[in-house]
Amino acid sequence: MSDENGPSKVDLQTAMRKMRALPPNKLCFDCGARNPTWCTVTYGVFLCIDCSAVHRNLGVHLTFVRSTNLDTNWTWLQLRAMQLGGNGNANQFFKAHGCNTTEAQQKYKSRAAQMYRDKLSTLCQEAQRKFGTQLIIDTVTHAEEKPAEEEDFFAQDFGHTSASATSLSSDAYIADHKSEDSTHGPSVDHLDSSVAVPTSAPVSVILKKPIKKATLGAKKNALGAQKVRINFDEIEQRAAEKERQTAAEVAANKLAYQTELDGKKKSDDAAALQKLSAKFAMQDIDAQRKQMEAKVAKDPTKAASVDRLGMGGVGRSRAAHSVAGGIRSIKQDDVLTFKKPSQPKEDDDWEVIDDKYGKKSTNNEDDFFSKDYTSSSSKKTTKEDDFFDSFETQPVQKSRYTASSSSSSTSRAPTTRLTAGASPISDVDLQKKFGNAKAISSDMYFGTPEMDCETRSALTKCEGQTSFGSEDLWGNGSQQRQSSQVPDMSDLKDSFRAGASKVAEKWSTLSSSFSTYMSRAPPATGEKT
């Protein structure tokens, strides 16, 4: 069913199916591709999808492209252009006007394209006025009504219909002539019937020959199939032999590479072992000792030089460890006793701690200033000493260097000594005894828990204290550090000055005491009698 604006979808599909069934419309107008589904309503030709893209680039002022399957909103003028045009009519018109190019820009901008576009538009307007909304139109009758004097494409294309008209007229003439004598001649009853005589389509006259379809497969020659003269067994045998040779070469190369790799690895291991032995391996001392003994036995004159230079380890310990021989336990032959180091008399260049007063100096003035006169008064038993003791005397203080030196000499920390008779303890017993201990002392290790009298007296002084250090226990920490310091000359000068002033004060006290004593002296024994 159709309307005034355009054909319906069903009518459009019917008309397109009928137009695509024509042989010229089965190929693309530009490239010749099969089954085109696009068209340009400006020229009324069918195109493929690739050529439709080219027409879109040309612009709608030259060509307007539409799809025959997807677009459904066609107008009657567009449908008339496809019905009156076609690929066959367009090809013939372009060839007649000398347009044989395949380039789209030149082809559709040429003079022939403009003339064909204008002519097709005029024919569409006339057919629309005559047929209106009729879907199927008679293009043959429409072509016959054209003036004969116009010799153009459409007149030439549809000129063959004149033969049909001539045949019809002659038939009609024959029918009229025979009607006078109805008893003779052929029957012409079909002329009076209302059924129209079918005529061939004018488009079929345009085609010279039907287009042949290309067939798949190879083209057969006149000779036909021939027998192959190739020995496939020989080819297969040569291929198998080639594979065996290749496999043998690969195996030989692999074996040679593995052998070379193993040799290189062994050489590297030997070099590494030699380097390690040169660096870290210890020589066997017993073997060297035997060699040296053999040399000494041959030449007795070498014994003195060997003992003097200590070569070969002769006379030394015969037990040693070796990397190759492993580690073994060595038993100690004897236990060495520790000797108390002798205290040097001179601690520094300034003072010597030796005498009972705590200091021995090379200068007589130092001995004079460092004497304590109050300590000697307790040893005197004469009356003169008792007399001097009755007076108050100021004690002379010792110099700080003398006191520090005397304290450092008299308060040395006792140390624990090993007895010569202590028996050595084996490693197994020590491991059993101290295996789980976190810390051990030398007394626990050597088994000497007894303390000497000096240590016991020092510990007695620190009883009752919560904490004490080595300085509190032995009393020599700060004094030893002070005595080891070198005194400054200014300090010595001050000390000498203080000592001189104290001596002068002492002499002044003694002289005043002696004067007082003489003034209070008792009368002589001769006067009493």
Swiss-Prot record:
SUPFAM superfamilies: ArfGap/RecO-like zinc finger (SSF57863). Residues 476-487 have a biased composition (Polar residues). Residues 399-420 have a biased composition (Low complexity). InterPro entries: ARFGAP/RecO, ArfGAP_dom, ArfGAP_dom_sf. The keyword Cytoplasm does not apply. Residues 291-301 have a biased composition (Basic and acidic residues). Keywords: GTPase activation, Metal-binding, Zinc, Zinc-finger. Residues 291-313, 335-357, 398-424, 468-493 are annotated as: Disordered. GTPase-activating protein for the ADP ribosylation factor family. This is Uncharacterized protein F07F6.4. It comes from Caenorhabditis elegans. The lineage of its organism: Eukaryota, Metazoa, Ecdysozoa, Nematoda, Chromadorea.
